Amino acid sequence: MHSVHPLTPDNVSINFAQHLRNFDPDGEKCRKALRKALDHIYDGQRTGRFSIDQVSKTEATHLGTMVEIYLRRTLDGFVSDGERMDFSIDGIDVDCKFSKTRFGWMIPTETVGNYAMVTHANDYERYWHLGFVYVTEEILTKGGNRDRKRSISKQGRQAIAWCWQEHTLPENTLLTLPKETVSLITSHRHGTQRINELFRVAQQRIITRNVIATVAQQADYMKRVRANGGARTTLAPEGIIILGGDYLEQRKIAQVLGITVPNKGEMISVRVSSNCDSQTPNTVSLAAKLWRVATDADPIEHAPTLPTT
């Protein structure tokens, strides 16, 4: 039943992959689970960390466990708890394996003769992949480590039934900003100042709650953004508005202005100018005036008040 050619995915793995694509058609659930697992390990609110290189080797070993936990939670209904392995899919035990390196899964002897869900995420290059494989001796390397764990050989990878390869990982904004920009943000002593700088220098970039928590490193980090004394108040005289995805009207404003529309739990800042008229494209009416995205040539003017619905 389990005689599998080492270079060909078996039918069960192919079915797993197809069923998961049916359950999560665009991979949105899986990619969000991987994003949450990475952010959990960074623990930015307490530590200010935002990359795997900043995490100790001991803490990094827990990343695979966090991936398993978040995938189990996110894919409930597609997977359930396994009897001998991490997951059960269609009554079949499946081991969950994550690797920080591209094809670096370490397979223990007890997984041989079982199925595995293999995953990888690269926060720097913003991609992830996930697939299923029936683990046989034929697909594994001959040598093992001290724990007798082996990796999947280059040829053996052809036995993987991929759900997604090179799929885009949700952006880690602090990783993609220039280092000097991040240094400017983190150079401020107080969380409120760091949040102000974040929205000042990272305009037209999606900022998630996790990024805000990492930069603020304070318990009530969202308070540092609000209009009653937070970044919205501080940056308004500089002509900068902060649009939140939690508000339908603010999402519409972003769309009309022609900038990236924030989703729920996301924000985006942009400097605006009232130097426009009804013929100007991408203008929005706020506080009885028309506004558009400002250019470097536009003078600074006080930003309008935003609707909070």
Which residue stretches match the model-derived regions?
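Nucleic-acid endonuclease domains
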Residues: 1-85, 89, 98-309
